[in-house]
């Protein structure tokens, strides 16, 4: 995933990075930072579920996070976070047992989730947001 995201944003200038992928949507820059924020949260949630008995996780307001000042930073900061995080996450996933993937956490708004289901969600999440960026590039002939 980190390589596909990096390819999707390669050679975009600041004006392009600050373009929303849809009307009233996040900019490319905000989207990249959101992926880093979201996947950091998910990695911590995985570790909580692996080390605690059905922990209740803390939701966060992702839209508000996307409006914070650090969302204006260069995307390279988040790309490095994503690359390092995914290296660690992939290692952890490879070491997990079938039993580990069935461990659960509780989300206060959406209920029980197994780690296997969460893994599917975040794999989709990566593809979904990367596609937002690649489709914007196609529409604008970037």
Predicted regions, residues:
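Acidic/histidine-rich alpha-helical segments that form the ligand environment
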Residues: 1-2, 6-8, 45, 66-102, ...
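A glycine-rich, hydrophobic loop/mini-helix early in the fold
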Residues: 2-22
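A short secondary-structure junction motif
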Residues: 8, 12-15, 53, 96-99, ...
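Short, contiguous alpha-helical
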Residues: 18-63, 90, 104-142
